[in-house]
């Protein structure tokens, strides 16, 4: 099989003491049974599944230790056990083998995603890619469309009131963005003019993200040359557009129906309903995915690790994708129940992100 770059997983570590081989084997069987069926598993079934010969009583003793460590719990009055969120995290981090996709699987994903390359727009291509990713993973697939890469041409400050100014950003493509800026008290017009000159000398030809990084560095180096009020106007100007990068970005979600498959109990249905509600809160999802763009690899959030979806007991597996210049411009991934098939979904999301990057010229 051809060599492929390794998958880089970015995930918090469980930080638990090393379990002995017997405990690991029993714990692995509990988790794998849960991922396969969604049902609690008891000591009698575990004793049949594990490689080493152990009586149900011995298995129960180990399960009691695992429960004390917070890795498993007993749901309601069931005699069986399920993994906790901490247990799932420990399994994903320390025990699970993230298999590489075989050539046939890669070819299947590549052929499905490459066919979207004839779409009329980037958004349409991503939409089609998501539909295929959702089908491959049997989960809801999400994508945050690319950031605007428009280059800046000019910035201008127009004073509206003693402590308010209009910031006008003009792009090389003719697009104009306006933001109202709160000025520090007592700022003279000369400081506003100097701030405008400082910014214009450094932003031309840069994207918004590039300009912000350049200005933060340049401002640190030029503090001795600028008076304090001018520095404050420059900092306020940078801040005025720093929160708006995600405002014109689209969140596309496909495959909601997959979340309704294989429900095991009424509480599952309630969790899915809560997840649907979370997905409707698109601003929160956009901000969450936007924050994940700083990562170089696959990120995994299990349950309450992701504050947005913590109430719905969901897992999120996401990976950034890139443009022709190799810059991260968006994020795609899947959202589903905590009993996702992690070993399969993780490499699928990773490979899908690589194919989308290729389609975008990355």
Curated annotation (Swiss-Prot):
GO MF annotation terms: DNA binding
Keyword field: Repressor, Stress response, Transcription, Transcription regulation
BP terms from Gene Ontology: negative regulation of DNA-templated transcription
Transmembrane segments: none
Family annotation (InterPro entries): GAF-like_dom_sf (IPR029016), HrcA (IPR002571), HrcA_C (IPR021153), WH-like_DNA-bd_sf (IPR036388), WH_DNA-bd_sf (IPR036390), WHTH_transcript_rep_HrcA_IDD (IPR023120)
SUPFAM superfamilies found in the cross-reference section: GAF domain-like, Winged helix' DNA-binding domain
Pfam families in the cross-refs: HrcA (PF01628)
UniProt family annotation: Belongs to the HrcA family.
Reported function: Negative regulator of class I heat shock genes (grpE-dnaK-dnaJ and groELS operons). Prevents heat-shock induction of these operons.
Stated name of the protein: Heat-inducible transcription repressor HrcA
Gene of this entry: hrcA
